[in-house]
A protein has these predicted regions:
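Intrinsic disorder in cytosolic terminal tails and internal cytosolic loops
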Residues: 440-445, 473-493
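C-terminal module of multi-pass small-molecule transporters
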Residues: 63-73, 86-90, 94, 106-110, ...
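Short, Lys/Arg-enriched, Gly/Pro-containing loop segments at transmembrane-helix junctions
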Residues: 182-186, 242-248, 412-417, 478-488
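Transmembrane core module of solute transporters
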Residues: 3-49, 154, 190-191, 204, ...
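Interfacial helix-cap and linker-helix signal at transmembrane-aqueous boundaries
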Residues: 27-28, 59-60, 148-153, 206, ...
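A membrane-interface helix-boundary motif in multi-pass transporters
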Residues: 151-160, 208-219, 287, 408-461
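C-terminal membrane-cytosol helix-exit motif in multi-pass small-molecule transporters
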Residues: 163-180, 196-207, 226-240, 466-476
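Transmembrane-helix bundle of Major Facilitator Superfamily
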Residues: 1-175, 316, 327, 334-337, ...
């Protein structure tokens, strides 16, 4: 029962990264988001989640993991309620940020609770296996669940669905999970705030550039403030006795390379889900449920890639899988750039999506191993937490860069399509366009497809960068694996 409670919490947190993707077109129409600002629905969650993840783990150590776990779950429930009731874009984004905060408190604590609740050996290993499976499959489950909820109810239920789940978790936790010992320590709140604010400003700068151009004053101010904030963050962490981000983790070449690869791959992955969801619903006219089902093969092929990597890692080592995985991801994304308004799911989307997923499956197993390589048991929680935080921050930053590419290509294509539309439009269509500024299909489909293709080009570049980092930075032979795994046992987090 304890494992069920912990796994349910992790599923709820992971699921919310993707469940809103299917609802994005409906959220856009309901709350009047622009296509470029729509990415904040994803980024508001992932930025606070990634930025505060390590602080959440530290809070569990100092205040007691069960207590902090319940608080994080209840905060997540409250944020889900507020998000479901949102009447405008600002209210929804504030609720999504609050959700990310709740997830950042609950998620690292739930992993640590496995270490304190289950005995070392097969029992604990089985628990970690269930936790990992839920973490890996949660994204695909979120897409399918989002499709069902939007199709049968409305977009608000992708948030409301968390409320009964969270309440049951909060009620069951005191009965089935024991409180852990408290460990004295300090909260590096300054470091957490500087890193989160710095990343938010950086992401805002890219999204602002997509809307108003690179010379816009607020765009430049955002980038400047982001540089100041992130520089201050590094200086604070170097001087802190108990930093939220242990900078010595980056001293190891292999581990630093691993974090760089995760940063690039997360950018590619978040972009693929975000823009492909828009494409299949707006251009291919898939219903929300059809869109959710369209992504189901992703999780199956990721599992196949992970299985292949796990089986042959002892023979070849992690580096070949990190290189090949990045190349496969890049090939899949480059293939997706060929989609146009005449594309079909089976002919133009499914194939590249499967190639991309196979590469990602190979990558994640290798990245997890390398992130925990040569790490003392007492620091495994920090190492794994840093990998998770890198994934969330990389996804947010990468998505904002892709949105910039999307917005630029969108605007260029619109300049081509508007004259064509005006030549062929009826008086009623012209009047509607002058009133709303929105092109109708098929002209709007051409504009969206041009933007999506540009975003996929940038995503493919991120995947190529991941492969190049693996070639240059990762230096592990198969004979080193026994030594690496010896220091990577589950830690208290």
């Amino acid at each position: 029962v304890a494992l069920l409670v912990i796994a349910a919490c992790q599923l709820m947190v992971v699921l919310d990264i993707t469940i809103v993707n299917i609802a994005l077109p409906h959220i856009q129409r309901s709350l009047d988001f622009s296509t470029t600002s729509l990415s904040w629905v994803v980024n508001a969650y992932t930025l606070t989640f990634g930025g505060l993840l390590l602080l959440g783990g530290r809070a569990g150590d100092i205040l007691g993991r069960r207590r902090v776990f319940v608080f994080g779950v209840l905060l997540f429930v409250l944020a889900s309620l507020l998000g479901g009731l949102a009447q405008n874009a600002g209210q929804l984004l504030a609720a999504r940020a609050l959700q990310g905060m709740g997830g950042a408190i609950a998620s690292p604590t739930s992993l640590a609770l496995i270490s304190t609740t289950f005995r070392e050996g097969p029992e604990r290993n089985r628990a970690f296996g269930v936790f990992a499976a839920v973490s890996a499959g949660g994204g695909a489950i979120g897409l399918l669940a989002g499709g069902v909820l939007v199709e049968w109810l409305n977009w608000r239920w992708v948030l409301f669905v968390n409320i009964p789940i969270g309440i049951l978790i909060a009620l069951a936790t005191p009965r089935w999970i024991k409180e852990s010992e408290r460990h004295p320590g300090r909260f590096d709140i300054t470091g957490a705030l500087l890193s989160t604010v710095g990343m938010v400003l950086l992401v805002y700068g890219f999204i602002r550039a997509a809307q108003d151009g690179w010379r816009d004053a607020l765009t430049l101010v955002s980038f400047g403030a982001a540089v100041v904030g992130l520089t201050a963050f590094v200086l604070v962490e170097r001087r802190s006795r108990q930093p939220i981000t242990p900078l010595h983790m980056f001293a190891d070449r292999n581990r630093a390379g691993t974090y760089g690869i995760m940063l690039c791959l997360a950018a590619a992955m978040f972009g693929m889900f975000f823009f492909l969801t828009l494409f299949v619903q707006n251009v291919l006219d898939f219903s929300p449920l059809q869109a959710g089902l369209a992504f189901l093969p992703v999780s199956a092929v990721i599992a196949i890639g992970a299985g292949l990597a796990s089986r042959f890692l002892p023979v070849y080592g992690p580096k070949p899988f990190m290189v090949v995985g990045g190349i496969l991801a890049a090939v899949g994304l480059a293939w997706l750039t060929l989609t146009d308004v005449h594309s079909t799911y089976a002919g133009s989307v499914l194939g590249p999506m499967l190639v991309f997923s196979l590469g990602m499956g190979m990558e994640f197993v290798s990245l997890t191993l390398m992130a925990l390589s040569n790490v003392p048991v007492r620091e495994t929680g920090a190492a794994s937490g840093l990998l998770n935080a890198t994934q969330q921050v990389g996804g947010s930053l990468g998505l904002s860069i892709l949105v910039t590419m999307f917005g630029t290509a969108n605007g260029n294509e619109a300049e081509k399509q508007i004259p064509r539309f005006l030549r062929q439009a009826t008086p009623v269509e012209r009047e509607r366009f002058q009133r709303t500024g929105e092109l109708p299909p098929p002209w709007s489909d051409e504009v969206l497809t041009a933007g999506v293709s540009a975003a996929f080009i940038m995503a493919a570049i991120f995947a190529v960068l991941a492969a190049l980092i693996a070639v240059v930075a990762i230096q592990v032979r198969p004979s080193d694996l026994q030594r690496l795994q010896g220091g990577a046992g589950p830690g208290p987090g």
